[in-house]
Amino acid sequence: MTEAVNQSLTSDFTPSCVAETPLLMRLSPHRQGKRAVLFDHFMKRLIRHGTLHVRLPQGDLRSYGTGQGPVAGFSVRSHAALQRLGLNPALALGEAYMDGDVLPEDCTLHELLDLLTLNLMQGGAHPAEKALEWVRWTKRRLDQFNPAGRARRNVAHHYDLNARLYALFLDRDREYSCAYFQTGEENLEEAQAAKKRHIAAKLKLDRPGLGVLDIGCGWGGMALTLAREWGAQVTGITLSAEQLAVARARAEEAGLSRQVRFALMDYRDWRQPVDRIVSVGMFEHVGLHHYADFFRMIRRVLKPQGVALVHAIGRADGPGSTNPWLAKYIFPGGYSPALSEVLPAVEKAGLFVTDIEILRLHYAKTIAHWRARFAGNRDAIASLYDERFCRMFEFYLSGAELAFRRMGHMNWQLQLTREQNALPLTRDYIWQAERQSVIRALGVGGIHSQSPPSP
């Protein structure tokens, strides 16, 4: 079924097909020509590296760029899409791909987006994009107002999708966040297990029974790991009813329901003191206006000798705004902050920053694994939703990978304490704890070397 749909969508688009579209029948050749001129002007400014071939709705083939380097192409199947691409490409390209109005030609979607991203990063920004930037800057201040009610709706938009969807492209533990590649050769399961070990080591879980709060616990993978492998007493909180049901079922199945509990709760409502706090992939949904609330909450409930670890997506180029397509279709209210926007709130909360680690290309590798698994299970995913949904997710995953590979996005891990003496003076305890975790998993006793693992 999916193969037939794809074949029909990628067939040659002739002028006779265009004439059958009611909207286009109402357009004069003059108006169609103006739209083509606007689009042509945009593409000439954008493509300065490599070559891009574009087939216009009337069948004309245009080529842009240097004629050297990477090559990609796409067809535009309607003049309405052509106009939207000329006026607001950041939103229109994804929408046109979802609707079948833009189709890659002689390349994959990922290759097409890679060439476009390469040119955007080389200074080929659309003039309208620059003009709209101040509007987006203002709008993001409103979008980032994220009280409890809106936060629940925003989370439900993406995370309350059918649980089977995520099982079809994530790892077995359903870790929907950046993995940790120590060599770059790990498979997805190995890299996600390494991520959990790395975070657990930074939490310094040096004795069983420590109380841990997992803010934004997802499907429970981190909480269950901390309980099973480190003896922690964990409470995971989420705003997703779908994730909550899966996490509780997993705890019951693992025989850990007395050691791990999950609740549908906003982080602002938590009151009980805890020894450790972990938050992985949730901070992007907090909202700029609420950073102070978030870190004050950590300061309030963390015990004096406690440790907190926040793992989130960030940007290296300073404050910005969320891509409009991503904000509309994938993560409403979401924002990946620069550390310069985060650290002032940490300081005002009275917390010590004891460690900051930047994970640069780790998320690009993670999403590449997700893309491959999504493609391998595309028919099954289409049976859960439809072709348009699959196109939306393909566009999202390809764009996200390129943001981390080419556009300065990265992950950061921020370790925080209330007291200066809560942790050892050096970071040696981190690699030692990771090594001990690996040895336990292999069933080997004792540490045979005091050298840190290779980076």
PLM region spans:
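Substrate-binding/catalytic lobe of Class I Rossmann-like enzymes that use SAM or dcSAM, i.e.
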Residues: 313-424, 431, 438
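Conserved class I S-adenosyl-L-methionine
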Residues: 208-216
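Conserved beta-strand signature within the Rossmann-like core of class I S-adenosyl-L-methionine
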Residues: 305-313
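Conserved SAM-binding loop
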Residues: 247-248
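A short acidic, Gly/Pro-enriched loop at the edge of an enzyme's catalytic core
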Residues: 268-277
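A short glycine-rich, Lys/Arg-flanked "PGG" loop and its adjoining helix->strand segment in the class I
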Residues: 292-304
